[in-house]
């Protein structure tokens, strides 16, 4: 015989709370790794989470030049000297963006999040991060970007708990870790309403 259906867990509502402790991601970078050619995160002993690829432009880039990434797996944010240029989504087939004019020596950051893996069929070898290369394309000319500094951000509590959190009331425009505390009279099932936030993880 089947056992009795257990009683439903209690449901609670958490009052609204605010975040006041913030650690900007780019100010809390882990140990850097160096590579001439770009490689997926598995080559850096990372299986999930987020990875940051950083290089400097060896020459000035003209407005209208295309940045081509082969390939983004799975969701990327692209920054030039800390300014967000665009976001690319593999699910939508987004692997290119048109750049503004950028000076020689501009710091180019590509922050890539892995969003799960294909686990069957011909795509089972689903590497994460950037799988092959990054190119600057102008007309019929292309130049592959080299000499990358790489930072791995695994998704686990031990990695994020010791960041340099600072008190602030101003939310940064850059990716960041957010931390707060709240008190409960009792515990139970609940949902967090993140509808006013952007993309991230709790």
Cite the ranges covered by each PLM segment.
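Ordered hydrophobic segments in well-structured contexts
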Residues: 50-54, 77, 87, 109-111, ...
